[in-house]
């Protein structure tokens, strides 16, 4: 099948030249599959991307209803697109988590890279064995855009269930600034004290953001 002017459509281009040869607009068009009456699927793909300023991050963070509200998209296409984006996120996580020995704050930052793009604050507890290998993890809290609560009871319940010798607590700052707040420092001290009582060490508390990370261990605050 050819488009006007004899150029190959995205699916045919992928077959001939591979997915790397396609633009984001063409890849989205393949996921959408069809356009709407009077509008080619490539035009619909362009409209959709323009709605989110051409940013895959913004598109990925958008809700189903917001994506479906773009004229010609609808809920079925929105669901398909969100599923494709989620698969991409999970692939990224798998690639970043090899190896899973978290013996530096840089590795922790890479391990939790998907958190930096979230618009809501979440808290992740990563459970480690004595050699700092990951043996489990749990997302504890989904907070508002500017606040998240971390309770030692929840953190160490996760650790004890995993039979962990240590934990790394990670949370994101949607603002993009990883600088810890006064509350972040107080929570870190509470977690450290609770861990000492329970015999499960707080290996690190890392704040991640689009502009980098802050490690309490690296900064000598643990």
From Swiss-Prot:
GO terms for biological process: proteolysis. One of its GO terms (molecular function) is metallopeptidase activity. Keywords: Hydrolase, Metal-binding, Metalloprotease, Protease, Zinc. Residues 101-222 form the MPN domain. Zn(2+) binds at residues 171, 173, 184. Disulfide bonds: none annotated. It comes from the Bacteria. Gene3D superfamilies: Cytidine Deaminase, domain 2. A motif (JAMM motif) lies at residues 171-184. Belongs to the UPF0758 family. This is UPF0758 protein Tpet_1235.
């Amino acid at each position: 099948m050819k488009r006007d002017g004899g150029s190959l459509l995205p699916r045919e281009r992928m077959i001939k030249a591979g997915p790397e040869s396609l633009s984001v607009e063409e890849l989205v068009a393949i996921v959408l599959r069809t356009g709407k009456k009077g509008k080619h699927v490539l035009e619909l793909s362009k409209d959709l991307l323009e709605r989110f300023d051409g940013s895959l991050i913004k598109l990925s963070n958008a809700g189903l209803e917001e994506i479906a509200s773009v004229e010609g998209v609808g809920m079925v296409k929105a669901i398909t697109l969100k599923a494709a984006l989620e698969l991409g996120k999970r692939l990224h996580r798998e690639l970043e988590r090899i190896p899973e020995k978290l013996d530096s704050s840089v590795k922790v930052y890479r391990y939790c890279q998907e958190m930096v793009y979230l618009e809501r604050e979440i808290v992740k507890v990563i459970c480690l064995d004595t050699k700092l290998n990951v043996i489990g993890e749990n997302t504890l809290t989904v907070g508002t855009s500017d606040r998240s609560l971390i309770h030692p009871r929840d953190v160490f319940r996760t650790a004890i269930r995993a039979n962990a010798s240590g934990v790394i607590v990670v949370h994101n700052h949607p603002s993009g600034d990883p600088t810890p707040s006064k509350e972040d420092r107080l929570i870190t001290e509470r977690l450290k004290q609770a861990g000492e009582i329970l015999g499960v060490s707080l290996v690190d508390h890392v704040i991640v953001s689009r502009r980098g990370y802050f490690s309490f261990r690296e900064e000598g605050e643990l």
